[in-house]
Amino acid sequence: MKIVIADDHAVVRTGFSMILNYQEDMEVVATAADGVEAYQKVLEHRPDVLILDLSMPPGESGLIATSKISESFPDTKILILTMFDDEEYLFHVLKSGAKGYILKNSPDEQLILAVRTVYQGETYVDMKLTTSLVNEFVNQSQTDEVSSSSDPFKILSKRELEILPLIAKGYGNKDIAEKLFVSVKTVEAHKTHIMTKLNLKSKPELVEYALKKKLLEF
């Protein structure tokens, strides 16, 4: 099987490549350092499996890349690399098209098993993350049942519409302030208004919302 590895740390790309290339049925055909490059490598090589770091540089997050790549290349199975502090993102990435999750500090044998599992079209989730994932699924299902049919997106101001995709892409308040020539306090105020108006509770929910509204493009 052909594999592409996307991670912003060179040591991870190199280490995982060595482990997987040692397997007779696996070949790492390319690596990438961010979401944009990952998309380009998948377009070029059409791999069977993409191993994708969830925590990517600002503007090219793993959550955004997962949605874009799974939509454009449904035959490429996406295996997410994650850390414990990324647990809140797991349910959202699953909804975006990922086939599995594995912790970066997992043993080599577990990585190999995860790759083979998603390659076969099955879902692989690290046991340490399963409870968190199930709880998030239950909470999200309950939220969906009581969600309003009205669209609060229409009441966002022009400035809030500018700031929303930047927040979703991972830019910090200072970076956004510099881009839009406003103060950091202004950005913080707009961010609060956006979260309140859209009834969003976390950054992953905001990213998912931005993806649904097609506000994020490579």
UniProtKB/Swiss-Prot annotation:
Keyword Transcription: yes
Keyword Transcription: yes
Gene Ontology CC annotations of this record: cytoplasm
Processing and modification events after translation: Phosphorylated by NreB.
Origin: domain of life: Bacteria
DNA-binding region in chain numbering: 173-192
TM ranges: none
Gene Ontology biological process terms in this record: phosphorelay signal transduction system; regulation of DNA-templated transcription
Keywords tagged on the record: Activator, Cytoplasm, DNA-binding, Phosphoprotein, Transcription, Transcription regulation, Two-component regulatory system
CDD domains: LuxR_C_like (cd06170), REC_NarL-like (cd17535)
Annotated function: Member of the two-component regulatory system NreB/NreC involved in the control of dissimilatory nitrate/nitrite reduction in response to oxygen. Phosphorylated NreC binds to a GC-rich palindromic sequence at the promoters of the nitrate (narGHJI) and nitrite (nir) reductase operons, as well as the putative nitrate transporter gene narT, and activates their expression.
Protein name (database record): Oxygen regulatory protein NreC
Gene from which the chain derives: nreC
